[in-house]
Amino acid sequence: MEESEYESVLCVKPEVHVYRIPPRATNRGYRASEWQLDQPSWSGRLRITAKGKVAYIKLEDRTSGELFAQAPVDQFPGTAVESVTDSSRYFVIRIEDGNGRRAFIGLGFGDRGDAFDFNVALQDHFKWVKQQCEFAKQAQNPDEGPKLDLGFKDGQTIKINIANMRKKEGAAGTPRARPTSAGGLSLLPPPPGGKSSTVIPPSGEQLSVGGSLVQPAVVSGSGGATELWPQSKPAAAATADIWGDFTKSTGSPSSQSQPGTGWVQF
């Protein structure tokens, strides 16, 4: 045993009883009813300690702490600690002295909760010992450990709901951008009402497009409303500005340039 290993305390119970047990003649388990339970051979304190992989059951005096007996346990359950067949409060432990002599004695608890704690403390210790052994084996042989299998088994299928994915993508989509004109200006939507608004020039005035005077055309079925756009030749209108320069019928086009805002000024 290494010198660097330290001793830890796993469980302490203030009162336990020790009994002399008759030798077992057959392979059947021990029975506490065969002991003299009303006349224990010794009573005192119990401590379970651990040093490395070995646990030690120590029976000590309540007042002075003097060691009465000690039972080293290297495996649980095993021959070092056995439960009786007729009660959960009594056990048979194998004690040893420093000279290698061994003896089996009966160990009893006055409360079932103390007996439960005694049993669980030993179970937890040897569960930890088992884990440490597995970790040591994996460290020595890392390739021998279980490998993660992410493949599909025979007949295994999965389901993907594409409809829900499309709904989520549509809800999280960005709004469409407004169409822009050739000059980079955003086009405003048409006014509500279903009828396009018309602008009628004052009486006696004419519109000039590209230096030519034109008369406003009357659209059939419009109730006499005049159309804003002049009925000029497409070739001549294409050479002018996209909206055209509108001037009054004074005889000469306006020399003042109009701002290219896209709106008709009168």
UniProtKB/Swiss-Prot annotation:
Residue span of motif WXXF motif 2: 263-266
Predominant cellular place of this UniProt entry's protein: membrane
GO biological process, one term: protein transport
Expression by tissue: Expressed in brain, heart, kidney, liver, lung, skeletal muscles and testis (at protein level).
Gene: Necap2
InterPro entries tied to this protein: NECAP_PHear, PH-like_dom_sf
Subcellular location: Cytoplasmic vesicle, Clathrin-coated vesicle membrane; Cell membrane
Name under which the protein is recorded: Adaptin ear-binding coat-associated protein 2
Subunit text: Interacts with AP1G1 and AP2A1 components of the adapter protein complexes AP-1 and AP-2. Interacts with the GAE domain proteins GGA1, GGA2 and GGA3.
